[in-house]
Design a protein with these regions (language model features):
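Ferredoxin-type iron-sulfur electron-transfer modules and their immediate structural context
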Residues: 1-55, 99
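A structural signal for short beta-strand/turn segments enriched in small hydrophobics and glycine
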Residues: 21, 25-26, 60-62, 66
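Flanking helices and flexible, charged tails adjoining ferredoxin-like Fe-S electron-transfer domains
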Residues: 43-55, 61-161
Length: 162
């Protein structure tokens, strides 16, 4: 358990990004997202890897080529297209929850943190106001905020209807 906790912390706070998992993924399921650093940001490096669940076929390339013996397809923060995909997985990650009104709405966030790797638990649902308040303290929630605000193209139409 100590190893998993250290690796989760290392990946999210590491001062360097090798990006090997991004380079070797044949489906482009691992991408590097620029994130703010310093100040109130929970990140120490300007790039974070996000794993996109819908694009991954779990070929294992990212794990095979990882110089840190990681398994990015299981360990990196994962963007799920809907709540049921997140609930069926054990990966740390999140899904945006919209009502039928959809676009323009401030979504709730369904999130499973890296700590779930140690003791898998069900995801936690946070209302928009609640999860927005945690963007400076929780790396996964901060990453979700970056995707929502700066990379909405990663959110499929299915995401907007979940």
């Amino acid at each position: 358990p100590d190893f998993a906790e250290r690796e989760a912390a290392r990946c999210l706070s590491c001062g360097s990004a090798c990006l090997r998992c991004v380079e070797v993924c044949p489906n482009r399921a691992n991408i590097a997202i620029p994130v703010p650093t310093g100040g109130a940001s929970p990140f120490s490096q300007g790039l974070q890897i996000i794993h996109i669940d819908d694009l991954c076929n779990q070929c294992g390339n990212c794990g095979f080529f990882c110089p840190y013996e990681g398994k990015p397809y299981e360990e990196k923060s994962t963007l799920f297209s809907n709540s049921s995909a997140l609930e069926q997985s054990t990966n740390p990650g999140f899904a945006f929850i919209y009502t039928e009104a959809g676009k323009g709405e401030k979504p709730a966030l369904l999130v499973r943190t890296n700590k779930a790797l140690l003791a898998p638990a069900g995801p936690e649902k946070l209302d928009y106001k609640d999860w927005q308040a945690k963007t400076s303290t929780d790396p996964i929630i901060a990453l979700a905020w970056q995707i929502l605000k700066e990379h909405p193209y990663l959110l499929s139409d299915q995401t907007r209807q979940s």
